A protein has these predicted regions:
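Noncatalytic carbohydrate-binding groove/subsite architecture in carbohydrate-active enzymes
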Residues: 122-245, 254
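Carbohydrate-binding surface patches
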Residues: 303-349
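Solvent-exposed beta-hairpin/edge-strand motifs
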Residues: 343-361
């Protein structure tokens, strides 16, 4: 959410959709306009409005403040740590977790003082900021939850940047969760290799690979912006609807407890809600929440094709559902998907099972000798077993 989409009406729609988390920048310059004086009033309203609706918050603590200069240097680094400490103290006990910066590996958000992003210099500067901020935050509020990383893109250069951070001691600092923004790949299923590679980097650096992760930002736009997946432009809305659901499912499969879609509103082509209209992606989310509310992922079923996905979900009453789809090849655009049928063993169930498509339309699949043969496409389908 941004300042023009964080009001009560938008939050009502987010709540109605069934989402549980929102991400919002807490901008340092808008809170500390005079040295040592903090005004949280505009964010108090937002936090209160979220709490009324049961929404939890990722608060992104951004950016430098002209009163102090860039946080790569003193006194700005210490002043940022003071600001972060004041934030977690002021909002102690609220449903907020705190992210240190947004995409600090990029020139866009870290600064133009380097020749390129993802550099050893940027990694050292960011690690120094985290090293200053985390102890101050934990002292002010020992229960605060801190996210570090906020890494933009999952590709060779961002992997190098993370390696530089880890070599500089990032993994020895007592933050709680590593956050990533997995742009740079064509499909959500490509996240799996990217996450595995990053875990290996952590392991190589001697870090705890069991530390929590979240995907704190990723969206798939309609046109040629960052994150564009390609394919037939006339099907852009459809592809976006596929991707938002598959992103949530893949992150769930990978053990990420929180996923943030970029973005709720806006004009960049990522929005779920555009100019008062619900996009196909919005409607797909509505079906997703309705179908899987109360269910937990049990396991991924084995398939002959590694790019076919069949996930089994179960609720507390023993009810079971499958979610099934197929993906393009690694780093291929969505139009490369080849729809096909597969055999899935479902055991002793009703002879006719209800299927629900991406937008909530229902159909029937026949069971023969304990096996169904649904047709897989890039759009996840929900299959109710019992």
């Amino acid at each position: 959410l941004k300042g023009d989409t964080d009001g009560p009406e938008d939050l009502d729609r987010v709540q109605e959709l069934g989402m549980k988390w929102v991400r919002r920048g807490f901008i340092w310059e808008s809170i500390e306009r005079e040295k040592g004086v903090y005004d949280f009033s505009q964010y108090d309203r937002f936090v209160n409005d979220c709490e009324k609706r049961g929404l939890k918050i990722i608060g992104c603590m951004a950016f430098s403040n002209k009163l102090y200069g860039h946080v790569k240097d003193e006194p700005a680094r210490s002043a940022y740590a003071d600001f972060a400490a004041e934030l977690v103290k002021h909002y102690k006990g609220r449903n907020i977790i705190w992210e240190i910066w947004n995409e600090p590996n990029t020139m866009t958000f870290w600064g133009r003082h380097g020749k390129v992003g993802n550099s050893p210099q940027y990694a050292r500067e960011y690690t120094d900021l985290v090293r200053a901020a985390v102890p101050a935050m934990k002292k002010a509020n020992p229960d605060c939850v801190i996210l570090a990383g906020s890494v933009s893109n999952m590709w060779s250069e961002s992997y190098k940047w993370m390696s530089y951070c880890f070599a500089d001691g990032m993994l020895d600092i007592h933050w709680d969760i590593w956050s990533v923004h997995p742009y740079g790949v064509k499909a959500p299923e490509d996240y799996m290799e990217a996450y595995s590679h990053t875990r290996n980097l952590m392991k190589k650096a001697g870090g705890d690979t069991g530390r929590l992760w979240i995907n704190s930002e990723r969206g798939f736009p309609l046109g040629k912006a960052e994150g564009y997946a390609g394919g037939d432009p006339s099907l852009a809305y459809e592809y976006q609807a596929w991707h938002v659901i598959r992103q949530y499912l893949v992150d769930l499969l990978e053990g990420l407890p929180v996923t943030i879609w970029y973005e709720w509103g806006g004009k960049e082509g990522f929005a779920l809600y555009r100019a008062g209209n619900m996009t196909p992606a919005y409607n797909a989310c509505k079906t997703f929440v309705k179908e899987l509310s109360g269910y937990k992922l049990d396991y991924r079923m084995k398939t002959e094709n590694k790019r076919d996905f069949v996930l089994r979900f179960i609720d507390k009453n023993g009810n079971e559902k499958l979610v099934a789809w197929t993906a393009p090849g690694v780093m291929e655009s969505p139009d490369k998907i080849v729809p096909h049928s597969i055999k899935i063993a479902v055991g002793d169930v009703s002879p006719r099972l209800v299927t629900t498509d991406l937008y909530g339309r229902t159909d029937i699949v026949e069971v023969s000798n304990g096996v169904i043969e649904p047709r897989l496409t890039g759009a996840p389908v929900y299959i109710t077993l019992r």
